[in-house]
Amino acid sequence: DMGVPILGTSADSVDAAEDRERFDEVLEKCEIDRPRGATVFTVDEALEVANKLGYPVLVRPSYVLGGAGMEIALNDGDIKKFMKIINRQFQEHPILIDKYLSGKEVEVDAVCDENGVLIPGVMEHVERAGVHSGDSISVYPPQKIKPEIKQVICDYTQRLAKALHVIGLINIQFIVYEDEVYVIEVNPRSSRTIPYISKVTD
């Protein structure tokens, strides 16, 4: 807003990755699926969406780091409890409600510029999907991901990095469910796994 240029990925691209409606447009353009879901602001909206999707659902605030505030809701009581907690901790943040897929969570860090996208490796989470990323363990190389699924993940990473015009680092979290790949979220920035993946792929 102050007219000062930002090095690396633009603020607009960061917003496109964080804003639900804009990110859905990016995914549609890239022909990539994500778990069904919606953005809500109130408990009543959350209950309506959760019952429409069917339990379990993933509840999390948007525009936060590392999956903070993320919870898996199994019923209406969980929704009411988690919405109260999230609204108290993350005031004025939209809340995302997604269908919970009990698949294998996979993570990718990549380095991008106008000439291409470098993917050092694909990391597989040990814990079930939905565990706070700061509390999870990942392994490299992935142990239970089929080569063809890994190729799809790399292809999706390329598409998303280019569509968002990322300059620098990007972190993408995927879920592999019944041999289908879904995007959970995209963070056009450095992640906690950068030091680890830079060492093990050196």
Each predicted region: which residue ranges?
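ATP-dependent carboxylate activation and anion-phosphoryl transfer catalytic cores
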Residues: D1-G8, D15, E21-R22, V26-C30, ...
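Short acidic-hydrophobic, aromatic-tinged amphipathic segments that line or gate anion-handling sites
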Residues: G37-T42, I72-N75
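Short acidic active-site motifs
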Residues: E45
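RNase H-like polynucleotidyl transferase catalytic core
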Residues: G8-S13, R36-T39
